[in-house]
Regions:
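Conserved catalytic core of the tyrosine transesterase superfamily
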Residues: 1-305
């Protein structure tokens, strides 16, 4: 019988040291595989189709389809590794059909005037700063918001940017995305570049010591939660009646580029999507925007017949 607990530990070490997965992804894998291990303790312990099917049913009773899909994907990757390492003879997912009835949810975006309000609030903080601490904090917050919107990076990617990943000479950002896939994004706006240069100049010592481009007040890597809290602070202070997350800047980045007739293949590259199918969901958002515009602005509305 497979020593499941030990092999899960070995697999997580492989993910950390050989696949170089992010701490966030590793944490999710650890939780997902621990849940599977707990379930397997109530079975005969065999890693087979029968137990996997029962586990799938078990997950559906407790989680939303999107969460089930993620947990099964983690388990598939684990079983694929077991087969590759010849710990098992055949992947138990082979010929096991799993269907997900996942509702198609369109990405939530931030209206452009709200993005302007948030950026203006950050710049206002910078102008109003009276102490060195206030200035440094406001400068970092402004740079974070500008870079989120300028590049469409995930918040995890932003917080993981290293000292050398932001090239202010060539105006590029090197991003290490999912699956350790690297992409380079150009920064085309001079105001964004100016704020990044000011931030880097002011925080150069902390950046050098931490090894990360964005740092907190303790001169350590800025956390994803800190970014969420910072955005919430501006939203709350400006009286914006929306729940805004860092990821919504990514959705807005993609959707607004589509509305400006940017080729979807370029947007796919900018977002770091391995499949264009993932990017195509933004076309539905752009289409709904188009419908609103035509309903309100089409000249036919002015014709009295």
């Amino acid at each position: 019988m497979l020593q499941l607990e030990k092999t899960i530990g070995d697999y997580l070490e492989y993910c950390e040291y050989q696949k170089n997965l992010s701490p966030h992804t590793l944490k999710a894998y650890r939780i997902d595989l621990s849940q599977f291990l707990q379930f397997m303790r109530g079975t005969d312990g065999e890693l087979n189709k029968s137990n996997l099917s029962r586990y799938y049913v078990h997950l559906h009773k407790a989680y939303k389809p999107k969460s089930v899909k993620r947990k099964i994907a983690c388990l598939k990757a684990f079983c694929g590794w077991l087969e590759y390492e010849e710990i098992i003879e055949q992947n138990p997912f082979f010929k096991l059909k799993i269907k997900y009835q996942e509702p198609r949810l369109l990405p939530r975006t931030i209206p452009i005037h709200v993005i302007q309000t948030l950026l203006s609030a950050a710049y206002d903080d910078l102008k109003a700063a009276r102490t060195a601490y206030q200035s440094r904090s406001a400068l970092r917050n402004t740079a974070v918001l500008e870079l989120l919107f300028a590049t469409g990076v995930r918040v995890s990617e932003l917080c993981s940017l290293g000292e050398g990943d932001v090239d202010l000479v060539n105006m590029t950002v090197r991003v290490l995305g999912k699956g350790s896939k690297e992409r380079v994004i150009q920064i085309g706006n001079t105001q964004v570049m100016q704020i990044l240069k000011r931030y880097q100049s002011t925080h150069s010592q902390a950046i050098s010591e931490s090894g990360f481009f964005f740092v907190n007040r303790d001169n350590r890597r800025l956390s994803e939660q800190s970014v969420r809290f910072m955005i919430h602070k501006y939203v709350d202070r400006q009286g914006i009646a929306l729940h805004i997350t860092p990821h919504m800047f990514r959705h807005s980045f993609a959707t607004l580029l589509l509305e400006e007739d940017v080729d979807i293949r370029y947007i796919q590259q900018l977002l770091g999507h391995s499949s264009i199918v993932t990017t195509q969901i933004y076309t539905h958002v752009a289409s709904s925007k188009q419908r609103d515009i035509l309903t309100a602005k089409h000249p036919r509305n002015k014709l009295a017949i």
